[in-house]
């Protein structure tokens, strides 16, 4: 196949199948695609951000998105956001009952409210100036 086969896909499951023909689960996004090996490197958003932050050596010249002094705080907030927001969106989307949908919906918007409150002090980022 060669080239950017991920970009030639119409549906996400095609990207997963091109990466690993034996895959049979749900095709989710985001994914980090390696054009050279034609493989999905990772499909977990927090991991992808860490890879972008430190996985490119001297090619990465931007700010440190995961500074050592803030890692515990970042990880804690990411875990909370993942449980109630990221997972809440999936729970709402795949809900099979109105009650399950309503609970997931409430989690998603409670998380957005909490994040908005955190940012209401004028900070630009969830962890202050970084």
Stretches found by the model and what they are:
Residues 24-25, 35-36, 40-130:
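GST-like fold's C-terminal all-alpha helical module
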Residues 1-43:
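N-terminal G-site of the GST-like fold
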């Amino acid at each position: 196949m060669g080239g950017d086969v991920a970009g030639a896909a119409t549906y996400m499951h095609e990207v997963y199948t091109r990466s690993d023909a034996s895959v049979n689960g749900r095709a989710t996004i985001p994914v980090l695609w390696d054009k050279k090996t034609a493989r999905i490197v990772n499909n977990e958003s927090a991991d992808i951000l860490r890879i972008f932050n430190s996985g490119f050596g001297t090619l990465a010249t931007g700010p440190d998105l995961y500074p050592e002094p803030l890692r515990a705080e970042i990880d804690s907030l990411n875990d909370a956001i993942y449980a109630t927001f990221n997972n809440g969106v999936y729970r709402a989307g795949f809900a099979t009952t109105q009650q399950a949908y309503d609970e997931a919906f409430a989690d998603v918007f409670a998380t957005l409210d909490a994040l908005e409150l955190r940012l209401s002090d004028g900070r630009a980022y969830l962890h202050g100036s970084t």
